[in-house]
Amino acid sequence: MRTLFDNIPLEQMNTSMTINATAPWLLSLYIAVAEEQGADVSKLQGTVQNDIIKEYLSRGTYICPPKPSLRMITDVAAYTREHLPKWNPMNVCSYHLQEAGATPEEELAFALATATAVLDDLKGKVPEEHFPAMVGRISFFVNAGIRFVTEMCKMRAFVELWDEICAERYGVEDPKFRRFRYGVQVNSLGLTEQQPENNVYRILIEMLAVTLSKNARARAVQLPAWNEALGLPRPWDQQWSLRMQQIMAFETDLLEYDDLFDGNPAVDRKVAALKEGARAELAQIDSMGGAVEAIEYMKSRLVDSNAERIMGIEDGGTTVVGVNRYQEAEESPLTAGDEAIMVADKDAEADQLARLATWKDARDDTAVQKALEAVRQAAATGTNIMIPSIEAAKVGVTTGEWGDVVRAAFGQYRAPTGVSKNPSNRTEGLEEIRAQVDAVSDKLGRRLKFLVGKPGLDGHSNGAEQIAARARDCGMDITYEGIRLTPDEIVTAAKAEEAHVVGLSILSGSHIPLIGELMEKMRAEGLGHIPVVVGGIIPEDDADRLRAMGVAKVYTPKDFELNRIMIDLVGLVDAAPLAAE
């Protein structure tokens, strides 16, 4: 943190940190650096995302169980009220909910339920007279998809529902504290690997949803790069997205007019329908005891909604240009050559480990251990975790060490996968594949066993969930234990479950080292006969390397027909040699 903000006066900055499970710690580091600079901490401005509930539902960067994690969220909020009054202690993030398949009604409801869970917990931690101002410091980070009229109506619904909740649930009288403050990144889920140049238009259209309506306009907009379905965007790609915003803001006349949609009956009807659907979901969540108690319910709803979305693309009910219609295309000069995407520096990890070792060698170990014990005691006794965390930051405690302490205090958590063992009601049209699965299962003498795994730290689980759910509906016996598995854990599970095929999902870019390690361990355990398939954001050169390691099939976003993948799996198992006796 000190290196990052070297010669940058934090007292004059407004810093936003997309950090969740370790939000108390990152804010502590920031405060420690600000104090080193001689800053007046009360003048610090910024935001920590600090939304752990969406991590359980969609993004996966959680550490501890929900209840102690909620406690740490409100510890941050209570501390900022007293010491950093200009800081936004939470940015409720519905962006990832839509990326995980949420309908507009679900995005509205799940985000608002998250906000109320936090505010309900915060009530006892701040003086009553200061609570309305704390409500006013809650901000949101939302998504905007291609159906931009519906998305614009969703934003108007967000504004109205939040005002209603603040007034009726929390008794906030000042309209300033009931304002729905939000930033946005438009949808990445809909960006396509096929004809990726079309993504430029998708991104621009999606931006309209959060800019056209003045009364529901985003305070901040960030746009993905056109080639994110291919790999990591280059600086030039990111610049192109920035230019879209600048042209919209400075060349058009959009910002010169009042709201263009006030009084429009079609818009009013859609907003009312979205609010009605969101209220029904909110009532369901409240009946379960709130967002924390309803995590498993919300996760299953997201998996089901995403399955419906994918089936719509597969059966042609939802048109995606270049994917399931208008597939003929000229070769794009934008994707030609080896430098069409950015490749991570292979030496970065070793460099970071070396710098970490140097850092640890230079600090006072006695002071570090004393500080960690203070964090441990705060976690155990319910004292605000921020106070000892700031002291720990000052003596050089690392993020990993802080995380180890809270993990030991509160426990390690595995979130629900949203994929049940029971088939869904979406088996229509799967009869032929189910018959193939039955036939192969008969030959095997037991049900075809498919192990789905997500190795590494990648928490984006949509693909793994949908593959597991479709395989289940096709009649396979599935095992899917969720995210953050080590190669050792996957190999152990493959052996224990006597898997017939292993499927791995990796979207972090670390597919080469992780798959290389896993394939070696599979062979060492006598499991080299089991076919392994891999899916993710995988450039073709890397796909060739994976196949050379022994991977049977490699899938990327262009392989959107899940039934085709299921047929491949059946064929691989049918052709695979039996294990040696």
Predicted regions span which residues?
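Short beta-strand/loop segments at the ligand-binding rim of alpha/beta enzyme cores
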Residues: R178-Y182, R446-K449, E525-V534
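Catalytic alpha/beta active-site cores
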Residues: M1-G145, T150-E151, R169, K176-Q185, ...
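Mobile "lid/hinge" segments at catalytic clefts and subdomain interfaces of large enzymes
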Residues: D51-I53, S69-K125, Y201-L282, M288, ...
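Secondary-structure transition/capping motifs at alpha-helix termini
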Residues: D6-M13, A32-Q45, A78-N88, A117-G136, ...
